[in-house]
Amino acid sequence: TRERLRQTGFAAAERLVQQLIHDRQYESAIPVCQAILAHDRAWEPAYRQLMQIYSAVGNRPQVVNSYNRCVAALREELDVEPSEETEALLNRLTS
């Protein structure tokens, strides 16, 4: 189905971002995350990846900004709060 293909594409993009993060190619990883979010504002894993990227380059304000954008998107699109995984990542990256 179309939804399954979309999710498969997002999963492939997430794997690409993880590889780029592993290779410390942070500037290349950011647009991939942004492309995912352009198609689905509430795709929480992309926000977590952005948080990891911004933390890796020492940009703590963007870590928090990415989290806040995630919270807003999840509330507006799905009426839910971020997952425990996202909350734990924020705490780990900002403590």
Predicted regions and their residues:
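Intrinsically disordered, charged and Pro/Gly-enriched terminal/linker segments
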Residues: T1-S95
